[in-house]
Structure formats: C-alpha cells, structure tokens
Amino acid sequence: HTQGWIHCHSAATDASGIVKCVMDELIEYFENMKLPGKLRIALACCLNMCGAVHCSDIAILGVHRRPPRIDHANLRKVCEIPNVSASCPTAAIRPATVDGNPSVEVIEERCMFCGNC
C-alpha cells in the first residue's frame, strides 16, 4: 500500500503506523524545504526488500520473526494450495495432507518470514 513517500508492496507489514511516525518526525523538513534535494524513504516488509529500499536515502525494514500459522481446517476455503506453495521464495511451504485433507506444511528452517504466503 502506498501512503506519502513510504510504501509497502505486500501485506506482510502494515505500513500505516510506520508512515505516520516517520512523517510526523519529518514533516517540518518537507514543509520548510530544508532538504538539499529529493529525499526517498522506503519501507520493505521483509528481507526480500522490494520497494527499492536498496537505493533509498532512508530505508526501513520490517522483520518478522515467526513462521506462518496454518489453519488446516479452512485453508482450502480461503486459498489455492498451489499458489500458496509457489508464493514462497525459499520453497519453505509445500503441499501436505493433514487428517486426510489437502493442506500445506512449513519447513521452518527455510522460512524467511516474508509473509508472501
């Protein structure tokens, strides 16, 4: 989602609170044009660092610390299992059968906690 100069490309981190805090601190610089040039501020939700944080003047990185929890009973109702598996950049999510129903499992050692799933 995009708000001001700070943006996030996935739902892994809610950028609203971070945007508010950062812009509250920097608003004076933007209002009075105290900066020598354009200032690029970017927010990335995970270590993939989309949002061009690698080439920004100020980069904010959201770090998640826990693997996703799986609701095996409702998984098939809310998503397509092949898409969930394909969304994982490290192949930490793979199809599995739980209690006779199709589901997924997370290999925690491979998970980078990006929230893409």
PLM features: what roles do these ranges have?
Residues 13, 79, 108-112:
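A short glycine-/small-residue-rich loop at the edge of a beta-strand within enzyme catalytic domains
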Residues 44-45, 105-107:
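Glycine-rich, charged/polar anion/phosphate-binding loops
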Residues 1-78:
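Small-residue-enriched alpha-helical segments and adjacent helix-cap loops
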Residues 83-103, 110-117:
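Iron-sulfur cluster-binding cysteine motifs and their immediate structural context
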Residues 64-66, 70, 96-99, 105-106:
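Acidic low-complexity intrinsically disordered segments
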